[in-house]
Amino acid sequence: MTNETFSERAFAFGRSQHLVGVLTKPPLAGAGPPPGIAFINSGIIHHVGANRIYVRLARALARRGAASLRFDLSGIGDSSQPSDQLDVSRAELEQRDIDDALSLMQREGVGRLIVAGLCSGADNSLTAIARNERVAGAVLLDPFVFRTRRYYVVHYGPRLLRPAVWWRALTGRSRVVGDMARSVVSRVSGSSAAPTADASLSASTAPTHAEFQARLEELMARGSRLLFVFTGGLLERYNYRDQLFDAFPRLDLRAHAELEFLPEADHTFSREAFQQQLEARLVAWYDTHFGSTATR
């Protein structure tokens, strides 16, 4: 597909030619190879993204001079399982798929590389940039996150101020006040004050706070550029703007990462207004760090 603002071409690639993706490129070459963004699946949603958000973002970025590859990981969407990788873990297989996608982009004339994804795609993106020095930036939409002291105050505080809640507790019809109060106290004092991981992730898959911090420190040392976007779909884990920065107080994360908090938006950006917000934020971040006038 070709028009005045972008061209799109489908590719089969990978070790077994089992991966399928669509490369979107800007119409005219600039002074050098265009930067490129690899969009990574969110769960089992194929390469168009939730509510076609990846398609929208890829075309918006093409208008800013960037290439994009929307592709399916092994066994998802149009991609099949590889014939020669049956002995590796799913996590390792997905990282090899991402490596293959980045190599394809470079063969097609793409310059600086960026990875992007929503939810599990964000988590895969963070792993990919940490293990692959070819990648200069990452866009992380509703990624894994740690709760903080303030998270619990924001979460429980309004409930503790409701007269009806206290009345039920005083009349013996509810234990919720005591339970909430004990939870708040335990989380904001003593050894429980450290940031805590998302309880929905198993202990075998969730990184520790120290591991996550070490990964961020490595990326900061390399000069990587990160964009974190959190939506209202993640309020049970992320409920105020600076929670990410508060979770890592020893890091100067603000110097390397930009943060957007969209509490009105849902997790899949289902409304046009939410998609417009995300598109504008991503384009602004791209222009600042990777666009034609960005400082290298």
Please place each PLM-identified region on the residue numbering.
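The alpha/beta-hydrolase serine catalytic core
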Residues: S89, R134-E279, W285
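Short, surface-exposed "cap/lid" segments of acyl-processing enzymes
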Residues: P26-D72, E236
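Gly/Ala-rich beta-loop-alpha elbow adjacent to hydrolase catalytic centers
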Residues: A116-S125
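Aromatic pocket-lining residues of Rossmann-like dinucleotide-binding sites
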Residues: L61, A128-I129
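Short glycine-enriched, charge-decorated loop/helix-capping segments at active-site entrances
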Residues: I53-Y54, S83-S89, Q275-Q276
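Alpha/beta-hydrolase active-site loop
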Residues: L86-E108, T127
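Glycine-rich "HGGG/HGxG" loop immediately N-terminal to the catalytic nucleophile
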Residues: F71-V88
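N-terminal cap/lid segment of alpha/beta-hydrolase-fold proteins
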Residues: M1-P35, R271
